């Protein structure tokens, strides 16, 4: 059945290029990309920290809600290092549904086949302003602004064969009609390494740069399926836009054998499918917190300044009014599981993106997000590695940033209370005794000649250990 579509068309005049000139231009774009750092480590010297709308608003987020969450982030979390405000998927749909990915969506789009913010949700985008006013508002709070996009080109743009901005190409020349995202019907893929495809990605990169976008989450590109050609094309386009823009790839699990490609183009990439507020899942979607240990163990040693494997968002706090999965609710993770989530993400140095509704933040969740000792592990630890996993107990070590000790994280994967005992040497620590500080409780615990701790089911501790 043909899908019903409604398009908002904006028109304006743009310069046209002769076909030969356009082809030469695109070749120059590709050749000069190497001269513009595609892995600008200054974009993400430490794992990015911020808020993403999907876990609480799904595909329904509007301008007032973005601003309210941004204000709360600026007032309460910015001083702890939280910086990004990211508008997740389908901000261009004028009739969003809580379930998302509707096959009867109406899209806002400009005359060049580029999605624009839905005016009934983002009124400041009127008069062809796009996200520029909202980005300026977020910037005025001392924060950075991000958006979600789906790889490819809108099907409607291809059906109408709209022109591609600043070129003599049209949408039909850029599209690969045989390639669609298996779980989102909005777009066709881009025909790999074609001048028209490069021209389209360059056109949207320049649009986002003009809006003031600092962070782009690109979906249906890192796994099921992995689209290396499109990753490279988008990376080149962002470089040519002349605005430093952080590139985040979703969903996971990104393939380990593509590590060099991922590092060459992106600042962060997902290493699992979506994480939600459960401990374990028998299904591939969604994943639970307890399912992340093995993935974190593989990827954490491969982190590098500017390039961060991503364990996905933090589904904590209030998930609503329209979460991307399930009914509106307070997170179903226990307090112990939430600490385990924050501890594993931090010691493996994953990006930290809050999923909860900041405008309904409670004291407990705020305490998780403002613990400077925990956040310091995520932002500044080195040599993070898992040293033990016996199926019930997981133990990690990481070096402190000052080189004066180690961080020691101990996790109980079992459902019941467990007493965990280990000699220091069994964990790769050569000293006879160590001074312990509990990072969650901010308490010095004195010296210990071995590790002995009782943990609740799915609980953890994070110590700073020093031989001095």
Describe each model-derived feature in a short phrase.
Residues 340-388:
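Catalytic cores of secreted or luminal carbohydrate-active enzymes
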Residues 174-179, 191-193, 199, 203, ...:
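Glycan-recognition surfaces
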Residues 339, 345-348, 353-355, 389-430:
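Carbohydrate-binding surface patches
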Residues 74-209, 213-220:
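Aromatic-lined carbohydrate-binding/catalytic grooves of carbohydrate-active enzymes
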Residues 143-158, 223, 239-256:
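Aromatic-lined carbohydrate-recognition surfaces of secreted/lumenal glycan-active proteins
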Residues 446-468:
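C-terminal beta-strand-rich structural cap/linker in extracellular carbohydrate-active enzymes
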Residues 20-31:
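Bacterial N-terminal signal peptides
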Residues 48-53, 83-88, 93, 144-149, ...:
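Structural recognition of the beta-strand scaffold that forms the well-ordered cores
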